[in-house]
């Protein structure tokens, strides 16, 4: 089994070099594929001998055992990529994953905040404190640009141009995009850079735009805790929250105000338009609710 796990590490190294996948994705693949190797081992199977029926049985067992459909989809993606790699590297003469059936994924609408709720969230930080001034700037940038949290905390000083009012983002797959900041976000960035960031750095020289209290790069988890803190202050139900709550609000509110779907796709950094289209369902649902509330024949 050690050889099997070593082969998985070789595959993950190759995947990182070819696709530049995020560390979180690689770690998830490692967990899924290690579980698969153990599952095969208990049945007297290996990566060299497993057949399509065996892999389909694994996926079915995961689903029946309460595995979420999204987790099963990720497992399937990892399995397919692994066996494609093994076939390409001549370790196998076939690809048993080629005809595996995909689990049906329920279409989950993004958690959505109204414009009034977003406004309350943005007003929650106390701007006379350097730490909360940083958070205020981060929230404003997040809502103005629709960045992923990982993209936001990874920003450097060289990524922003306040004169041009844009931010350069390196997104998934190492793809670069330029996103407008808007006047409000530029104002709060200027204020933070003058009155907040120097206090946080306390003489330390780093290029990170939004450093932590220890003058290091902030983690996604830390910022998520900050968002929850301000949501409580703003009186927002925790069930409406997710780490990407302002990214979702950014997309939905743009569409509500008539933005073109492809423009929103470009701003979000989605490679596939279908990923962006889910936000149209949120916007349509909001219109349906308003119609029911206000139309005399609804």
Swiss-Prot record:
Its main location: cytoplasm. It is found in: Cytoplasm. Residues 2-87 form the Core-binding (CB) domain. Residues 108-292 form the Tyr recombinase domain. Pfam families: Phage_int_SAM_1, Phage_integrase. Keywords: Cell cycle, Cell division, Chromosome partition, Cytoplasm, DNA integration, DNA recombination, DNA-binding. GO terms for molecular function: DNA binding; tyrosine-based site-specific recombinase activity. It comes from the Bacteria. GO terms for cellular component: cytoplasm. Belongs to the 'phage' integrase family. XerD subfamily. This is Tyrosine recombinase XerD. The lineage of its organism: Bacteria, Pseudomonadati, Pseudomonadota, Gammaproteobacteria, Enterobacterales.
């Amino acid at each position: 089994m050690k050889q099997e796990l070593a082969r998985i590490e070789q595959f993950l190294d190759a995947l990182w070099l070819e696709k530049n996948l995020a560390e979180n994705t690689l770690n998830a693949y490692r967990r899924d594929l290690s579980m698969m190797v153990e599952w095969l081992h208990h049945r007297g199977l290996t990566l060299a001998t497993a057949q399509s029926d065996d892999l389909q049985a694994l996926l079915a067992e995961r689903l029946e055992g309460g595995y979420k459909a999204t987790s099963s989809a990720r497992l399937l993606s990892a399995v397919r990529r692994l066996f494609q790699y093994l076939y390409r590297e001549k370790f196998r003469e076939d690809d048993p994953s080629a005809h595996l059936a995909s689990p049906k994924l329920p279409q989950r609408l993004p958690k959505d905040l109204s414009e009034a709720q977003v406004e309350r969230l943005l007003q929650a930080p106390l701007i006379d404190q350097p730490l909360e001034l940083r958070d205020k700037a981060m929230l404003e940038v997040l809502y103005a640009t629709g960045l992923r949290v990982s993209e936001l905390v990874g920003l450097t000083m060289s990524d922003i141009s306040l004169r041009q009012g844009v931010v350069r983002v390196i997104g998934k797959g190492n793809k670069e995009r330029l996103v407008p900041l808007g006047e409000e976000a530029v104002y709060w960035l200027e204020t933070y850079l003058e009155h907040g960031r120097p206090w946080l750095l306390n003489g330390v020289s780093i290029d990170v735009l939004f450093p932590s209290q220890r003058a290091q790069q902030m983690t996604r988890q830390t910022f998520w805790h900050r968002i929850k803190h301000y949501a409580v202050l703003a009186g927002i139900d925790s069930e409406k929250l997710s780490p990407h709550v302002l990214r979702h609000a950014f997309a939905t509110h743009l569409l509500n105000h008539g933005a073109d779907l492809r423009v929103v796709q470009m701003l979000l950094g989605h490679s596939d338009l279908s990923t962006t289209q889910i936000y149209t369902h949120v916007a349509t649902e909001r219109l349906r609710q308003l119609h029911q509330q206000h139309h005399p024949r609804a």
